[in-house]
Amino acid sequence: MERADKDLAFLLRYENVAWFEDGEVRILDRRIYPAKVEFVTCRTHQEVARAITDMVTQSAGPYTAAPMGMALAAWECRGKSADEQMEYLKKAAYTISHARPTTQKRMTLLCDICLKEAERALSAGENVAEAIKNKTIQLNNVRYERMAKIGSYLVDMFPDNGTVMTHCFAETIVGTMLRECRSRGKNIRLFCPETRPYFQGARLTASVCHDMGFDVTVISDNMPAFVMQNEKVDVFTTAADAICCDGHVVNKVGTFQNAIVAKYMGIPYFVTGAPDQGHETVDSIHIEMRDPNFTLQAMGVRTAMEGVKGYYPAFDITPPHLVSGVVTDLGIYSPYDLHRYFTDGSIGRDNLVI
């Protein structure tokens, strides 16, 4: 099967996200990359779910780890009857899909696809674990190819020799965006806020940009306004953990404040991804509150006195009036007209997963 991760950075290659083989799922530990290149080995699907919860893999990484975890679950129950295997896999699907509250709907969709593939493989007498693994690769190809289309539309918004600011780690879109810039001969420079407390901007986004040969600068999270004002930023762009059909954008905490500054500075903010039919309005969003102790440290080194309190909402919500456009694989849409996305193209369940 031809793969869509060709010419992308190390971090975006399928095997370096999550990979099932020989009764194990290996997940690149993004919590410590690039200082260390280590993989967490999961020998049960529960361990895969725990790795997702514990942020071993982040951004779109769970969308590879989850179906690979389903392949592992199929391997675990391979000696059972067909009915028993399906029952086991349904329980595994619940465990994996509920590993992180904010992405539960998309993860459920992914796991449902794996369940259908398991039913098909059982009926055909095939190896269920390998069938789900191959389905995962197929899903990745679909997602990466869609991201390439999104990258092309997004790059249209970049001026030659332009300056782009990101936030957190937009995963595949970063790689496909840069690959498109390179293919067009369009030179850009990038500013990446570090994105505490996990430093995804510094460790992941900046690493991908550097790996692919682009001028990239890491800034602290309190610098975006200064940089937008003094470094002639042309575009602010992020991906999203969810794009509600009413135009609200759910993404890594800090996106909202950067969007406010961008609006004030007259800098367009483009969010990338597909509208989420599972979130018709922002009212269905649950903001995940994580361990507040993470805000009291930096890469494991405590920065605050004992007894000081922390506060850690993982995401925030940017209202549509701050969004210049939603960049999809079908083009760029107004945040107030997202339902048109679903009438403009024939979107199947497999293709809804970003």
Feature roles, as predicted:
Residues 132-169, 173:
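Active-site pocket-lining segments that scaffold enzyme catalytic pockets across diverse folds
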Residues 195-354:
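Conserved phosphate- and dinucleotide-binding cores of soluble alpha/beta proteins
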Residues 36-46, 124, 129-130, 146, ...:
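Acidic-glycine-rich active-site phosphate/pyrophosphate-binding loop
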Residues 167-216:
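Glycine-rich phosphate/diphosphate-binding loop of Rossmann-like nucleotide-binding domains
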Residues 145-152, 174, 218-221, 251-254:
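Active-site glycine-rich loop that binds ribose-phosphate moieties when present
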Residues 112, 116-143:
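HTH-adjacent hinge/linker in prokaryotic transcriptional regulators
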Residues 69-76, 113-116, 178-186, 208, ...:
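A glycine- and small-aliphatic-rich helix-loop capping segment at beta-alpha/alpha-beta transitions
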Residues 8-124:
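Long amphipathic alpha-helical segments
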